[in-house]
A protein has these predicted regions:
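Conserved N-terminal subdomain of the carbohydrate kinase-like
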Residues: 1-79
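A non-catalytic, amphipathic alpha-helix used as a structural packing/dimerization or gating element
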Residues: 23-26, 88, 92, 123, ...
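Short, small-residue alpha-helix embedded
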Residues: 108-109, 171-195
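Conserved phosphate/ATP/ADP-binding segment of small-molecule kinases
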Residues: 83-161
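Phosphate-handling active-site elements
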Residues: 160-162, 188-202
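Short pre-catalytic strand/loop immediately N-terminal to key active-site residues, enriched for Gly-Thr
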Residues: 161-175
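Active-site-proximal loop/turn and secondary-structure-junction residues that shape catalytic pockets
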Residues: 46, 72, 106, 142, ...
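Charged C-terminal helix
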Residues: 196-224
């Protein structure tokens, strides 16, 4: 379901166009009438109008479990969600999430917690769960050249929690990391796997894609 389109290249996003509410709602309708959809994920929900139409039209009966990838801010600082829409996102989208997968910066924005320590990241995950997300993955940052691993914190619906750790790869080829991670989780849930298996497989696949980069573009290229 197309909610927005962007113009950009490896240097960054230059502009975006949000789809009309009626067009988004129509896509929900026609897809649910024809396909047996086993899982879904969100992407860029740019403003109040888009958030409302997605929340009004999504249902687990027609679209399966929902992976919420809160596309709020890119790794390079570009804002993709209007500031005025943060509270509505918390109220209407997060409670729909079977899994929510914010990156380090998005989790800071959604929770107001700095997360300078592991304990604060755990606190932020519980905060998001308190907002209604069943399972939470807070992805680690990739901006410290001294780091040796990238550590994601996972908090499951049953209270179980663990860290997913992979070696840090110093590279500018990271575009699509979060999109791919959430898409793989959705695909694994669609196959009937549980959340723990889904997030672990997603972490493994994204690490392999980062560790074997493609030389595409002149700046911040995509993962493989």
């Amino acid at each position: 379901i197309l909610t927005a389109a962007v113009s950009g290249n490896s240097y960054g996003i230059t502009s975006s166009q949000v789809m009309p509410q009626e067009f988004i709602a129509e896509q929900f309708k026609v897809l649910s009438e024809d396909f047996d959809i086993k899982a879904a994920k969100t992407g860029m929900l740019a403003n109040d109008d888009v958030i409302n139409v997605v929340a009004d039209n999504y249902s687990p009966e027609h679209f399966g479990p929902l992976v919420v990838d809160p596309v709020i801010i890119t790794k390079h600082g570009a804002m993709l969600l209007e500031q005025s829409a943060y509270e509505l996102f918390r109220e209407r989208i997060i409670p729909l999430a079977t899994v929510i997968t914010p990156n380090f910066y998005e989790a800071q924005k959604l929770t107001g917690i700095e997360m300078t320590t592991d304990e604060e990241r755990v606190k932020a995950a519980h905060y998001l769960q308190d907002l209604g997300a069943k399972n939470v993955v807070i992805k680690g940052a990739h901006n410290d050249d001294s780091q040796t691993t990238v550590d994601d914190f996972v908090l499951l619906e049953d209270g179980d929690s663990f860290w997913l750790k992979k070696p840090f790869v110093k590279t500018d080829r990271l575009n699509g990391t979060g999109d791919s991670f959430s898409a793989i989780i959705a695909a694994e849930l669609a196959k009937g796997n549980n959340v723990k298996i889904a997030v672990t497989k997603a972490k493994d696949a994204v690490y392999a894609a980062i560790a074997n980069p493609l030389t595409v573009g002149h700046k911040f290229g995509p993962i493989n």
